[in-house]
UniProtKB/Swiss-Prot annotation:
Binds to 23S rRNA. Forms part of two intersubunit bridges in the 70S ribosome. This is Large ribosomal subunit protein uL14. Part of the 50S ribosomal subunit. Forms a cluster with proteins L3 and L19. In the 70S ribosome, L14 and L19 interact and together make contacts with the 16S rRNA in bridges B5 and B8. SMART domains: Ribosomal_L14. The keyword RNA-binding applies. PANTHER family: 50S/60S RIBOSOMAL PROTEIN L14/L23, LARGE RIBOSOMAL SUBUNIT PROTEIN UL14M. Pfam families: Ribosomal_L14. GO terms for molecular function: large ribosomal subunit rRNA binding; structural constituent of ribosome. It comes from Bradyrhizobium diazoefficiens (strain JCM 10833 / BCRC 13528 / IAM 13628 / NBRC 14792 / USDA 110). The keyword Metal-binding does not apply. It comes from the Bacteria. HAMAP family: Ribosomal_uL14. Belongs to the universal ribosomal protein uL14 family. InterPro entries: Ribosomal_uL14, Ribosomal_uL14_bac-type, Ribosomal_uL14_CS, Ribosomal_uL14_sf.
Length: 122
């Protein structure tokens, strides 16, 4: 569960390393985001010569959360770190590569571009 002020890793090669959630999109009183949800983030740490720089405000898709995710078959999936992928206003990833596994739940939220770039889908 991601809320305001949550720090996340960036799972792509956009140049950002760490971001902080500053808003969860989807309703005026929406408090938490989970896998596949879109959040507004501020870039807190970035590498030199990247596509983004520290202080930029962008949208991101949450791809990994530490909170347990229950599936319809009763299984549970959980990741070690919270992570997100930066997207532009057309909901396309800013980076050209995705690092680490992503869950199948992204398919239901129509983030097919992220799934196709990911090295592993759980």
């Amino acid at each position: 569960m991601i809320q305001m002020q949550t720090n996340l890793d960036v799972a792509d090669n956009s140049g950002a390393r760490r971001v902080m959630c500053i808003k969860v999109l989807g309703g005026s009183k929406r408090r938490y985001a989970t896998i596949g949800d879109i959040i507004v983030v501020s870039i807190k740490e970035a590498i030199p010569r990247g596509k983004v720089k520290k202080g930029d405000v962008m949208k991101a898709v949450v791809v990994r959360v530490r909170k347990d995710i229950r599936r319809a078959d009763g299984s549970v999936i959980r990741f070690d770190r919270n992570a997100a992928v930066l997207i532009n206003n057309q909901s396309e990833p800013v980076g050209t590569r995705i690092f680490g596994p992503v869950p199948r739940e992204l398919r239901a939220k129509n983030h097919m571009k992220i799934i196709s770039l990911a090295p592993e889908v759980l």
